[in-house]
Amino acid sequence: MTEAQPDKKTAILDTALVLFTTRGFQGTPTSLISREAGVATGTLFFYFATKEDLIDELYRVIKSEAGAAINDGIENKNSIKEKICRVGKNGISWGIKNPEKMQFMEQFAHSPFVSTTAHEEGMSHFLFLQELIREGIKEGVIRNYDPDLLCMMLAASLSGLIARVTAEPDPKKRGLLVGQGMEFLWNGIAA
């Protein structure tokens, strides 16, 4: 038996992303995903036993990609503030470049269609942020609040900032909004 080609798996995931964000989970049958991806339905089921497995894998892949993107370059920064600002700017950049992935994460972040295991695996890519916040609390530069709460508040604020920056057509104003947003984010958690 010949193994299916890896690019077919990518085509399935890319197609599922578009369809799930535009039609929802319930409104997206596997037959449509297969047809739009240009693969046989059997090929889809070769990679993903169920539609739930497909959405779990898509969730994990996107979370992994986002986590790696926002973590990029923080080791080169000296202070906690610089690291948090780098995380924020990386998140904004990734979100602007990946609007469908942002929409998917927002749409399925608390969805019962994504398994608890996939949620936990997805969030594991952001543990560095909790550690960074704990370090900031220990140093006295970040408020002594629950680190999970601070992470959630940062994520929600970044999501809103990405939406606002994305909607702004003027590049100069976009830069101003990013600066104001980062100042707001830091001031919200600074001790």
Give the ranges of each region predicted by the language model.
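Short, hydrophobic secondary-structure boundary micro-motifs
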Residues: M102-E106, T117, Y145, R174
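Hydrophobic alpha-helical connector segments
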Residues: E57, N71-K97, C151-L154
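Short hydrophobic/aromatic patch on the recognition helix
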Residues: A37-F48
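Basic, helix-initiating cap at the start of DNA-binding domains
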Residues: M1-R23, T28-E36, D53
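Amphipathic alpha-helical packing segments from all-alpha helical-bundle domains
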Residues: S64-G67, N71, K97, V114-E139, ...
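C-terminal peripheral helix-coil segments that are non-catalytic and often amphipathic
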Residues: T2, R86-K89, S93, L127-E139, ...
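Alpha-helical DNA-contacting segments of helix-turn-helix folds
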Residues: I55-I62
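Amphipathic alpha-helical segments used for helix-helix packing
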Residues: G95-F113, A163-A167
